C-alpha cells in the first residue's frame, strides 16, 4: 500500500483529536447490561474514546448511539458519533459505517448549521470516500469558521494533493505545522518531502511525528509503520523490520504493523512468514491492498487456487466500498492493470480515476493502464508526467520503464528498471522479478 493511502486514512480521523481524543481511543470501561441515562451514556463514550491506548470498540459507538437516542438534538454528541463511525470503519474495514457517519454529521448541521466540527467531519468523510473536490469545499468552509486553527489545513492540503495542486497543498501543510506542530502536521510535511524526492527529509519529519505521538499507543504504532515503509522503500530491510516489530509491540494486534511485517518478510524472500503475517492482518482488517499482497504471495509460493480465492475477496471489498459511496477507480485500475484484466475497460476506469484525481498517481494509473493495454505511444506522456515532482518511487520508475519498453525504447526501459531496483531491490512482489529478469539479474 502506498503511503498516500495510509495518510488519507489517518487524515480522515486526525481531525477528531480536538473532540476528546477520538484518534486511537480505547474502551476504558465496558457498560453493564441495561439502558443508561443519556448523560451517563455520553460520559462512558467519552471515556471510551479517550487517548489512553488501544482502539475504539463497538461498545463505545453503542454508548454514543444511546446518548443520541436520548438527546437527538445534541449536536456535540452527533458530531462525536459521526467521527466514531469513521474510526469504526478504519478499525474494521466495514464501509457500512460511512453512511451512518454522514447521517450523524448532517443531523448535527441541521441542529447547528455552522458547527465547525461537523463541517470538518464531513470533510474527513469526503477524504475517505475519495471525493476530493467536496473535501476541499468542506475544508475551506471549516477554515472560515475556525480562524487560526490548524485542523482545516489538513483537510485542505490532503484534498489539494489528490487534485494535483501541489504548491497550494504544500503551503497548506506548512501553515498547518506553523499553527500547531503535531503528529498530523509533521506526517503531512513528511509526505510532501517524499513526493518531491526528499526521502531522508521525509523520514526526519516522520520521526518528529513519532515524538509528537507522545507514547500514545496507536499514534506511536502508526508513525513507526510509516517510517518502516520509508525504510523499506529505500532498501533498508533490517531497519524496516525492526520498526514494524516495534509498532506491533506498541499496539499488539495492530493490523497495519502485521501487514508491514509481511512486506518486509516478502522482501527477504521469506514467503512462508509473509503469508502467515498477511493472513493474520487481513483476517483482522481486510483491506484491498492487504488482500492483494496476500494473493501475490500465494501466487509466488505456487498456490494458485488460494491466490484466486484472495483475488475474489478483493472484488468483494471493492463492491462493498462502492456501495458505501467510496470511489475506488484509481485503486481498481491499478489492480486490474497489474493482472491484465479487461485492458480496454481498465483504460476507461483509469481515465475516470485520473479525471477525479489529477495527481501524479492519477497520471501513473492512466499511463500504466495504457501500457498494459499495448497503447504505448499514449502511455508514455502520462508515465513521464507521473515523475514531474521528482518523486523517488520505484514502482513509478518501473511503470515508466515498462511504457518505454512497450514503445520500443529498450535502453530507456533498462535504465528505469535499474533505477527502480537500485532504489529498492524488492519494490514489488509481482514486478521486481520482472525487472531483474529484463536486466539479466539473478
Task: Go through each PLM region and give its residues.
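TPR-repeat structural position
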Residues: 57, 91, 98, 132, ...
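Canonical tetratricopeptide repeat
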Residues: 80, 121, 155, 188-189, ...
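Register position in tetratricopeptide repeats
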Residues: 87, 128-129, 162-163, 195-196, ...
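Residue-level recognition of tetratricopeptide repeat
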Residues: 83, 87-90, 124, 158, ...
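N-terminal leader/linker segments that initiate helical-solenoid repeat arrays
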Residues: 2-111, 116-117, 137, 425-426, ...
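Start-of-helix register in tetratricopeptide repeats
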Residues: 76, 83, 117, 151, ...
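Short coil turns that delineate tetratricopeptide repeat
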Residues: 72, 113, 147, 180-181, ...
Amino acid at each position: 500500500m502506498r503511503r498516500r493511502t495510509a495518510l488519507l486514512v489517518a487524515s480522515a480521523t486526525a481531525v477528531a483529536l480536538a473532540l476528546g481524543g477520538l484518534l486511537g481511543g480505547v474502551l476504558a470501561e465496558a457498560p453493564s447490561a441495561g439502558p443508561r441515562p443519556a448523560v451517563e451514556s455520553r460520559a462512558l463514550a467519552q471515556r471510551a474514546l479517550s487517548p489512553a491506548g488501544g482502539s475504539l470498540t463497538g461498545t463505545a459507538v453503542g454508548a454514543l448511539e444511546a446518548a443520541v437516542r436520548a438527546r437527538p438534538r445534541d449536536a456535540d454528541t452527533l458530531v462525536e458519533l459521526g467521527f466514531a463511525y469513521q474510526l469504526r470503519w478504519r478499525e474494521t474495514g466495514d464501509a457500512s459505517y460511512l453512511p451512518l457517519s454522514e447521517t450523524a454529521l448532517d443531523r448535527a448541521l441541521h441542529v447547528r448549521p455552522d458547527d465547525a466540527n461537523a463541517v470538518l467531519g464531513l470533510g474527513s468523510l469526503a477524504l475517505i470516500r475519495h471525493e476530493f473536490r467536496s473535501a476541499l469545499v468542506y475544508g475551506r468552509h471549516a477554515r472560515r469558521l475556525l480562524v487560526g486553527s490548524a485542523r482545516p489545513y489538513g483537510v485542505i492540503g490532503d484534498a489539494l494533493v489528490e487534485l494535483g495542486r501541489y504548491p497550494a497543498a504544500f503551503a497548506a501543510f506548512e501553515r498547518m505545522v506553523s499553527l500547531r506542530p503535531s503528529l498530523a502536521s509533521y506526517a503531512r510535511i513528511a509526505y510532501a518531502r517524499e513526493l518531491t524526492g526528499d526521502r531522508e527529509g521525509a523520514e526526519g519529519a516522520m520521526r518528529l511525528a513519532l515524538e509528537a505521538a507522545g507514547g500514545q499507543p496507536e499514534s506511536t504504532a502508526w508513525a513507526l509503520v510509516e517510517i518502516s515503509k520509508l525504510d523499506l522503500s529505500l532498501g533498508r530491510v533490517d531497519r524496516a523490520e525492526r520498526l514494524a516489530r516495534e509498532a506491533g509491540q506498541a499496539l499488539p494486534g495492530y493490523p497495519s504493523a502485521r501487514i508491514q511485517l509481511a512486506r518486509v518478510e516478502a522482501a527477504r524472500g521469506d514467503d512462508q512468514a509473509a503469508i502467515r503475517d498477511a493472513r493474520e492482518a487481513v483476517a483482522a482488517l481486510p483491506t484491498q491492498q492487504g488482500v492483494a499482497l496476500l494473493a501475490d504471495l500465494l501466487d509466488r509460493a505456487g498456490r494458485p487456487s488460494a491466490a484466486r480465492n484472495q483475488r475474489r475477496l478483493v472484488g468483494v471489498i471493492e463492491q462493498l466500498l462502492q456501495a458505501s459511496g467510496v470511489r475506488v477507480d484509481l485503486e481498481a485500475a491499478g489492480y486490474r492493470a497489474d493482472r491484465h484484466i479487461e485492458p480496454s475497460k481498465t483504460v476507461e476506469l483509469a481515465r475516470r480515476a485520473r479525471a477525479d484525481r489529477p495527481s501524479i498517481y492519477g497520471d501513473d494509473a492512466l499511463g500504466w493502464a495504457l501500457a498494459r493495454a499495448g497503447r504505448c505511444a499514449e502511455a508514455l506522456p502520462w508515465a513521464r508526467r507521473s515523475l514531474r515532482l521528482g518523486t523517488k518511487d520505484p514502482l513509478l520508475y518501473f511503470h515508466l520503464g515498462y511504457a518505454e519498453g512497450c514503445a520500443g525504447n529498450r535502453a530507456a526501459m533498462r535504465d528505469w528498471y535499474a533505477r527502480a531496483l537500485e532504489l529498492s531491490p524488492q519494490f514489488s512482489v509481482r514486478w521486481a522479478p520482472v525487472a531483474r529478469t529484463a536486466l539479466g539479474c539473478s
